[in-house]
Design a protein with these regions (language model features):
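Catalytic core of membrane glycerolipid acyltransferases/transacylases, capturing the structured
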Residues: 5-73, 77, 87-104
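Non-catalytic C-terminal accessory region of glycerolipid acyltransferases
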Residues: 73-169
Length: 169
């Protein structure tokens, strides 16, 4: 409602594992309220941008590869940037913690907002964790496989949900 004009860092919690229906819903609602004159730019994980068909869709909807450099450039150009600091750790939190916000100690978004002198707009997304059950976060497996270094992931979760069935990611 009362979001400032000009650049801002929109900070939200990350839900729903490998789906991205909530960010799509946020973007659609923002568009209905603000139109094309004040669009959102979502920072997305490298793995999402690496998939050719998905990359095309993401780019067309204003998404960009998540990096400090990209966020800096967008904010300096007066854009609104959406970040989900909790990343995979939060997206794949156990079902019993579905209503908890888990940023995992990540505070880079605060430093970014201070450095660029832009406001932080908090956003809370709920409902995504109602569509699937994280049976195990797989943090230890991710650590053993060095996934944080290889693909910037702190989890290798085991989950159950539609339409995926039993999966991991």
């Amino acid at each position: 409602e009362n979001v400032t004009k000009g650049p801002a860092l929109v900070v939200g919690n990350h839900n729903a594992g490998i789906t991205f229906l909530e960010p799509i819903g946020l973007g659609a609602r923002w568009y209905l309220e603000k139109g094309l004159n004040d669009t959102l730019h979502f920072l997305v994980h490298d793995a999402m941008v690496a998939l050719p068909l998905l990359r095309t869709f993401l780019i067309r909807t204003g998404c960009v590869r998540a990096s400090h450099e990209t966020a800096n450039k967008l904010l300096q150009r007066g854009k609104k940037v959406v970040v989900f600091p909790g990343g995979n750790l939060e997206a794949f939190r156990p079902y019993k913690n579905r209503y908890k916000i888990t940023f995992g100690g990540k505070k880079g978004f605060i430093r970014l907002a201070l450095r660029e002198q832009v406001p932080i707009v908090p956003v809370v997304l709920v409902g995504g964790h109602e569509t699937f059950f994280v049976l195990h976060d797989g943090a230890r497996i991710a650590e053993l496989l060095k996934l944080k270094k290889l693909v910037r992931s702190e989890t290798c979760a085991l989950f159950l949900g539609l339409p995926w069935g039993l999966g991991f990611g």
